Amino acid sequence: YSDIPLNGNITTNKQKELIHGYKACVSYIDSQVGKLLSKLEELGLSENTIIVLWGDHGWHLGDHGLWIKHTNFEQAVNSPMIIYSPDHGLENNKSNSPVELLDIYPTLCDLAGIDTPSEVQGKSISQVMVDPTHKVRQAALAQYTRMSGGKRVMGYSLRDEKYRYTKWIQMDYKSGERYGNTIACELYDYEIDPYEKIN
C-alpha cells in the first residue's frame, strides 16, 4: 500500500484493493478466533473462560471520501466488540445499546464475580448480554481532533440509539485549554440518514 497518494483521489482499482485487503483481514481474524475457540474446547476450558474481542475503532472504506480510521463519524467511532461468557447471555445476541470501551473492565469484573473498584468510570454491560434491549447508559461519548483553518479543533461526539451530535471547539487538545468558540456542530438522525449525509 505504499502507492497511496497523500492527497487527491484514489483510483477505482486501488479502492477495490483496499476493500479486498480489509475484508481479508476480517476473514483472517475470524479464522484465528475460530482456532482459539477450538483450542479452548479441546483443552476443556471453554466453559470456564470469558472471551472479549474488541477493536479500538472502526474504519472508513471510502465513505465520506475517507480511507482512514480517525474521525467522529459512525464508521470510525463504532468499534467492533464481542463478549462471550459461558454463564451469561444467549449466543449471537446483538444490541444497539450505547456502550463505551471503558465499560469492558467493569463488565469483566461483573462476569468474574469480583467487585469493581469504586474509582472505575465504566458500567457493566453484563445485563445487555442477557437482554439486548437493556440500557446501561443513554449515550456514548467519543472525541477526536482535526485541523480547521490552520488550528486544531476538538470534536466531542455524543451518540444515542437514534442520533449523533458532534460539537467542534477550538482548543489545545493536549492541555485541554479552550482558545476559541464552537466552530461547527453536526447532527445526524440514523433512522432517516444512516450514512450521515444530512446535517
Region annotations inferred by a language model:
Residues 57-63, 89, 102-105, 110-190, ...:
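C-terminal cap/loop subdomain of S1 sulfatases and analogous C-terminal strand-loop tails that border
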Residues 1-98, 111-119, 174-185, 196:
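Active-site-proximal cap/lid insertion segments
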